């Protein structure tokens, strides 16, 4: 018992460790002979080569089943979301306020519009084509250069008085501001049967404070009638249409009451667009609050 309980010295432990690392009597290194180390190394090398090959084969088969022209992620919404420019968000959604007599209060809003429309200049649309059919532009083949599909031009001048070309202030200076409305893209989405979807902007009453004897909102739409031409649909995806630009509709609000906050809703009217989803306030429509001080 005394021998078993005897503690080994540091030199004894180091000697045993060196003997384990290399045993000159048996020719073993770390408990195995060099030949066995070679065989076990070859076994693991072969094992991981086979596993890597199987993994690569699985990835290859998976990639062959994926359509490169279909987005990796798609929303579950059947109707496109709608966005507004300029977009200034308050605590509860879009809230825009400015003073007609103070240029600094609306300079940032017009800068947002100019920056947004920079992608709709003729130079930026030079790879797109002119479309005038007013019908759905179906493309079964990839006839455009680099195995892509054609995209229709949409330039800022199509927004006429709301293009920022003739009036750089977009009507904000005179209290008749322009707002640009855009539908989000959905691959192969057809908004209606045979009629172009259009924008309809109206005052939205507060259920708790209904307004009385108020005239309807007067709006000038650009392009005329506030329509999104059908030849911009369907959209085939970013890879198939790398030069695609969303069509736009500008709404110039003509009779917004001054010095008070009003709620405005702009809806997309089309056969296949819904705007009554209580879970998504931006599906098929956009709501915002506007205050014009004078």
UniProtKB/Swiss-Prot annotation:
GO terms for cellular component: apical plasma membrane; endoplasmic reticulum; plasma membrane; potassium:proton exchanging ATPase complex; sodium:potassium-exchanging ATPase complex. It is a single-pass type II membrane protein. The keyword Cell inner membrane does not apply. Expressed in parietal cells (at protein level). The chain crosses the membrane at residues 37-57. N-glycosylation is necessary for assembly and functional expression of the pump at the plasma membrane. Residues 194-294 are annotated as: immunoglobulin-like. The keyword Lyase does not apply. Residues 58-294 are extracellular. GO terms for molecular function: heterocyclic compound binding; P-type potassium:proton transporter activity. Glycans are attached at residues 99, 103, 130, 146, 161, 193, 225. Keywords: Cell adhesion, Cell membrane, Disulfide bond, Glycoprotein, Hydrogen ion transport, Ion transport, Membrane, Potassium, Potassium transport, Signal-anchor, Transmembrane, Transmembrane helix, Transport. Disulfide bonds join 131-152, 162-178, 201-266. The C-terminal lobe folds into an immunoglobulin-like domain and mediates cell adhesion properties. The beta subunit of the gastric H(+)/K(+) ATPase pump which transports H(+) ions in exchange for K(+) ions across the apical membrane of parietal cells. Plays a structural and regulatory role in the assembly and membrane targeting of a functionally active pump. Within a transport cycle, the transfer of a H(+) ion across the membrane is coupled to ATP hydrolysis and is associated with a transient phosphorylation of the alpha subunit that shifts the pump conformation from inward-facing (E1) to outward-facing state (E2). This is Potassium-transporting ATPase subunit beta.
């Amino acid at each position: 018992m005394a021998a078993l309980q005897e503690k080994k010295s540091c030199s004894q432990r180091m000697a045993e460790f060196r003997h384990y690392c290399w045993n000159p009597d048996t020719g073993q290194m770390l408990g195995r002979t060099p030949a066995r180390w070679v065989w076990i190394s070859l076994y693991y090398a072969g094992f991981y080569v086979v596993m890597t090959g199987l993994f690569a084969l699985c990835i290859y088969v998976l990639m062959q089943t994926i359509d490169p022209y279909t987005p990796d992620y798609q929303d579950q919404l059947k109707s496109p979301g709608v966005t507004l420019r300029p977009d200034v968000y308050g605590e509860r959604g879009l809230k825009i306020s400015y003073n007609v007599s103070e240029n600094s209060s609306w300079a940032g809003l017009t800068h947002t519009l100019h920056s947004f429309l920079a992608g709709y200049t003729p130079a930026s649309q030079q790879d797109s084509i002119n479309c005038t059919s007013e019908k759905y532009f179906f493309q079964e083949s990839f006839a455009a250069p680099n195995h892509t599909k054609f995209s229709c031009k949409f330039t800022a001048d199509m927004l006429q008085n709301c293009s920022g070309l003739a009036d750089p202030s977009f009507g904000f200076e005179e209290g008749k501001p322009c707002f640009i409305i855009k539908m989000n893209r959905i691959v192969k989405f057809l908004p209606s049967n045979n009629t172009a979807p259009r924008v309809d902007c109206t005052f939205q009453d507060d259920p708790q404070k209904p307004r009385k004897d108020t005239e309807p909102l007067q709006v000038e739409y650009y392009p005329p009638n506030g329509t999104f031409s059908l030849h911009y649909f369907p959209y085939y995806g970013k890879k198939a249409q790398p030069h695609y630009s969303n069509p736009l509709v500008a709404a110039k609000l003509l009779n917004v009451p001054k010095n008070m906050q009003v709620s405005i809703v702009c809806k997309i009217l089309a056969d296949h667009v819904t705007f009554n989803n209580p879970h998504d306030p931006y599906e098929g429509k956009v709501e915002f609050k506007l205050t014009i001080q004078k």
